[in-house]
């Protein structure tokens, strides 16, 4: 029975609770909510009031996030072997992004620093309809979700008839965002573009998934054109990008100062250029009663006491408490200037702000960037004047998002699992720092009834490539990389990428078998994943599954003519014909090579006889009694 059969919508959450609160589970596996409340009672305030987001299919969406993918990862060996791609850390995945996210979680959980997505807006004209390939019956769904047969039938109807309702859009987005949350690093952030049609719903599901306290704001971007005025309303000239952090207390990174900003820093001392602002707090919460610990006397250059009195005459407060003020004085950050207050010339304190290392907090209103029309023209130029996309986000928009992402450093990963026109990949290549990207895009067949898609399909056919959306996205990356190199021959950024496709095996394998019948001679199909896709597919899928990622430097090791694959704590044996000489060679490698210590031996079960596997186990069992004291774990996979 496959593991997916026993999964429930809350399987991930239950696993987390079992790991951290084992005492709250009874012997039969049931969860004791009262014991859990008692455990938390002295640590948190338990609220009995609140609200939650509900929509048709929410539990179904959570179930989809829990079900493991059955796809395999097929490397594009011809593309990946090209010099510009062979050592690239960038990854492009062709496949359903739900499957792609599930594969990524096995290697990149909590490792992605920045996620940007531009999902379907569900406007009615963007082609969004909900469909999925899961083959649940109403009875199965009713049992898994603990709902009525009628509710189960309504959910299945949504999944099969190509609905574009709000519930369908929410059901589509919810599992993808659940998985995306688990990919984010603790100091990472996700940026999600949307327009007016679903922005309210997006805010609700993001609050539900990421936590309302982790919302870092909403970017309002001018698109450069106004739409929707025909309806009699105001129309729209903006779209939005919600920003959520993985955890609270993250700070958006600052932007470089503009020429206008730099004009403020027109003073200079031995520490460098600086601007200054008065020490007294201004604006809201500036009264003594608002900050009583920040109301105190300080000495001016003449030795007189100075209090934070507002020009209106009321007692105000300083910007900092006394201890911090004393440190500012010690560091020479306090500047005294003569000024006129209430008709009298007096000393007044200011705080210096030095230019070095200073940036500015970005505004949520972004009107200075070029709009979508120019972005579309730029992509058209890349394709020699051919318009292959109707709607494209500007590269500068994504670059600015990367720029303000918290705590970004070289080598960090940027993910876009609605890659589309591949603007995110283009932006990453143009950034000054060396980041890596992962793109995921469904290989949707381009629609010849849409002019730009028909043109794109013809373009791809002329260069001998399939007419799918992922292919035109990859071609955009290739052409952008060429242009970047032409403009800067000294660039050392990673401008290549490795390509992988997600494919569903056609045969029934042992790990997928739901029911065994010894009388069913047609139970097994003649081909295996190895026969259908080859060694590199099996190996790549396993490497990602075991946490090594898509670009792991695996080593092919020769064992008396038999090739095994070694990385980290794993030795993979996939091919057939594991003879005695090879088994002896594997054992001797363990015994004589001090750097060869894989604790896990993974075997492709179809390739070996019972005798071969037992012989290998017997030979390697003696390693636990030798100097290395290794106890080998055998993992037989199908």
Give the positions of each predicted feature:
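Conserved proline-anchored active-site loop of SAM-dependent methyltransferases
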Residues: 110-128, 206, 414-428, 543
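DnaQ-like (DEDDh/DEDDy) 3′-5′ exonuclease domain used for proofreading
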Residues: 1-116, 121-175, 333, 455, ...
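Cysteine-dependent PTP/DSP-like catalytic domain, specifically the C-terminal lobe
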Residues: 153-163, 168, 217-222, 226-229, ...
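Signature of N6-adenine DNA methyltransferases within the class I
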Residues: 173, 186-187, 196-257
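Phosphate/ATP-binding catalytic cores across multiple sugar-kinase/actin-like superfamilies
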Residues: 97-100, 104-107, 172-177, 183-184, ...
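Active-site-adjacent helix-turn-beta-strand microarchitecture at beta-sheet edges
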Residues: 247-384
């Amino acid at each position: 029975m496959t593991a997916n059969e026993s999964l429930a919508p809350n399987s991930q959450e239950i696993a987390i609770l079992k790991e951290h609160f084992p005492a709250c589970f009874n012997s039969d596996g049931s969860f004791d909510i009262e014991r859990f409340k008692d455990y938390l009672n002295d640590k948190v305030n338990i609220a009995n009031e609140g609200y939650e987001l509900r929509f048709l299919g929410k539990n179904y969406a959570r179930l989809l996030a829990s079900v493991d993918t059955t796809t395999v990862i097929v490397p594009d060996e011809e593309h990946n072997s090209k010099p510009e791609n062979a050592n690239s850390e960038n990854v492009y995945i062709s496949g359903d992004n739900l499957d792609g996210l599930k594969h990524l979680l096995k290697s990149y959980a909590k490792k992605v620093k920045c996620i940007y997505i531009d999902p379907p807006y569900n406007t009615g004209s963007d082609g969004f309809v909900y469909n999925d390939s899961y083959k649940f019956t109403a009875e199965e769904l009713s049992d898994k979700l603990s709902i009525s047969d009628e509710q189960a039938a309504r959910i299945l109807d949504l999944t099969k008839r190509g609905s574009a309702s709000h519930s369908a859009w929410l059901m589509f987005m919810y599992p993808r965002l659940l998985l995306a949350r688990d990919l984010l690093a603790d100091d990472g952030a996700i940026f999600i573009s949307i327009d007016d049609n679903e922005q309210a719903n997006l805010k609700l599901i993001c609050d539900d998934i990421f936590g309302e306290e982790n919302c870092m704001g909403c970017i309002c971007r001018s698109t450069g054109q106004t739409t929707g005025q025909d309806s009699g309303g105001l129309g729209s000239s903006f779209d939005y990008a919600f920003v959520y952090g993985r955890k609270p207390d993250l700070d958006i990174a600052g932007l470089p100062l503009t020429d206008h900003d730099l004009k403020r820093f027109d003073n200079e001392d031995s520490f460098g250029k600086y601007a200054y602002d008065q020490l007294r707090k201004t604006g809201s919460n500036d009264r003594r009663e608002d900050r009583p610990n920040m109301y105190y006397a300080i000495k001016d250059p003449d030795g007189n006491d100075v209090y934070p009195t507002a020009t209106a005459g009321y007692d105000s407060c300083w910007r900092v408490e006394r201890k911090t003020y004393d440190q500012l004085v010690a560091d020479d950050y306090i500047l005294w200037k003569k000024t006129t207050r209430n008709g009298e010339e007096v000393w007044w304190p200011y705080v210096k702000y030095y230019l070095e290392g200073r940036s500015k907090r970005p505004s949520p209103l972004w009107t200075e960037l070029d709009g979508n029309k120019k972005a579309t023209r730029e992509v058209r130029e890349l394709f020699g004047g051919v318009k292959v996309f109707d709607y494209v986000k500007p590269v500068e928009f994504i670059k600015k998002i990367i720029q303000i992402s918290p705590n970004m450093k070289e080598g960090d990963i940027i993910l876009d699992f609605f890659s589309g026109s591949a603007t995110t990949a283009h932006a990453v290549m143009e950034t000054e720092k060396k980041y890596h990207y992962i793109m995921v895009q469904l290989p949707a067949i381009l629609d010849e009834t849409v002019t730009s898609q028909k043109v794109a399909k013809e373009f791809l056919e002329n260069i001998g490539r399939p007419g799918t959306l992922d292919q035109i996205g990859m071609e955009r990356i290739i052409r952008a990389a060429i242009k970047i190199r032409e403009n800067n021959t000294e660039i050392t950024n990673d401008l290549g990428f490795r390509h992988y496709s997600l494919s569903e095996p056609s045969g029934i394998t042992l790990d997928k078998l739901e029911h065994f019948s010894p009388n069913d001679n047609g139970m097994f199909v003649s081909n295996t994943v190895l026969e259908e896709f080859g060694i590199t597919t099996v190996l790549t899928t396993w490497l990602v599954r075991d946490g090594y990622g898509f670009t792991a430097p695996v080593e092919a090791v020769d064992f008396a003519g038999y090739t095994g694959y070694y990385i980290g704590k794993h030795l993979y044996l996939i091919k057939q014909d594991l003879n005695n000489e090879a088994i002896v060679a594997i054992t001797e490698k363990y015994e004589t090579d001090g750097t060869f210590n894989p604790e896990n031996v993974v075997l492709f079960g179809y390739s070996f006889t019972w005798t071969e596997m037992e012989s290998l186990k017997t030979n390697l069992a003696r390693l636990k009694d030798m100097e290395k004291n290794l106890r080998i774990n055998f993992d037989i996979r199908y």
